[in-house]
From Swiss-Prot:
Quaternary structure, from the entry: Homodimer; non-covalently linked.
Tissue specificity: Expressed by the venom gland.
Keywords in alphabetical order: Cleavage on pair of basic residues, Disulfide bond, Growth factor, Lipid-binding, Metalloenzyme inhibitor, Metalloprotease inhibitor, Protease inhibitor, Secreted, Signal, Toxin
Record bears the keyword Lyase: no
Protein name, as recorded: Venom nerve growth factor 3
Pfam entry (one): NGF
Positions of the propeptide removed during maturation: 19-125
Functional note: Nerve growth factor is important for the development and maintenance of the sympathetic and sensory nervous systems. It stimulates division and differentiation of sympathetic and embryonic sensory neurons as well as basal forebrain cholinergic neurons in the brain. Its relevance in the snake venom is not clear. However, it has been shown to inhibit metalloproteinase-dependent proteolysis of platelet glycoprotein Ib alpha, suggesting a metalloproteinase inhibition to prevent metalloprotease autodigestion and/or protection against prey proteases.
Gene Ontology terms: biological process: cell surface receptor protein tyrosine kinase signaling pathway; modulation of chemical synaptic transmission; negative regulation of neuron apoptotic process; nerve development; nerve growth factor signaling pathway; neuron projection morphogenesis
GO CC aspect terms: axon; dendrite; extracellular space; synaptic vesicle
Residues spanning the signal sequence: 1-18
């Protein structure tokens, strides 16, 4: 009887020893480990594919340099932004083509304060034309429509000025009408104003600036801000002290 019990116990122990081991304790290189490695690799591959697809659908944010370059490119602007425009200046023009150098021409279309196309280019400045018969300016000036990419705002900070905007599927450029001295001379003695008595006064011509409301880039959004542009050439006179 005891021999039978010993035989059964030995057979039971042999059976336990010969049973397959669990996957938690499988040594490296075993088939179970290979299956786990293959599964892990497959999951990693799927994760990489998903990451690539996500990057394609949601590209990484652009660098500051790229944003600055893009800010002067063709940007789609919400028409409602022009409804919020105040303090409109005749020196700021949105045009689909270069404005004429002569202010007498009326062929350029631009966006006005009412979000409509307007052909009245600087009409107010034509009310007092300058005649060439015996009339001369104290300082010679030159005016032209220019494109600005950067400017100084009213707070003294450099800002990025929008050049091209896309409104209603049409591209407009932002122009600024600037006036400056024709031949600015840093030496006041050599840039006397015309018609000023040099025996009593020291005089010189200088370019003055003012602020106009322009469309600029602030981060990733377009916004209206006051920027500084050249607007006139004026004469500065200083009384000579020797006469007192």
């Amino acid at each position: 009887m005891s021999m039978l019990c010993y035989t059964l116990i030995i057979a039971f122990l042999i059976g336990i020893w010969a049973a397959p081991k669990s996957e938690d304790n499988v040594p490296l290189g075993s088939p179970a480990t290979s299956d786990l490695s293959d599964t892990s690799c497959a999951q990693t591959h799927e994760g990489l594919k998903t990451s690539r697809n996500t990057d394609q659908r949601h590209p990484a944010p652009k660098k500051a340099e790229d944003q600055e370059l893009g800010s002067v490119a063709n940007i789609i602007v919400d028409p409602k932004l022009f409804q919020k425009r105040r303090f409109q200046s005749s020196r700021v023009l949105f045009s689909t083509q270069p404005p004429p150098l002569s202010r007498d021409e009326q062929s350029v279309e631009f966006l006005d304060n009412e979000d409509t196309l307007n052909r009245n280019i600087r009409a107010k400045r034509e009310n007092h034309p300058v005649h060439n018969q015996g009339e001369h300016s104290v300082c010679d000036s030159v005016s032209d429509w220019v494109i600005k990419t950067t400017a100084t705002d009213i707070r003294g900070n450099m800002v990025t000025v929008m050049v091209d905007i896309n409104r209603d599927n049409e591209v407009y450029k932002q122009y600024f009408f600037e006036t400056k001295c024709r031949n600015p001379n840093p030496n006041p003695v050599q840039s006397e104003c015309r018609g000023i008595d040099s025996r009593l006064w020291n005089s010189y011509c200088t370019t003055t600036r003012t602020f106009v409301r322009a469309l600029t880039m602030e981060g990733n959004q377009a916004s209206w801000r006051f920027i500084r542009i050249d607007t006139a050439c004026v004469c500065v006179i200083i009384r000579k002290t020797d006469n007192f």
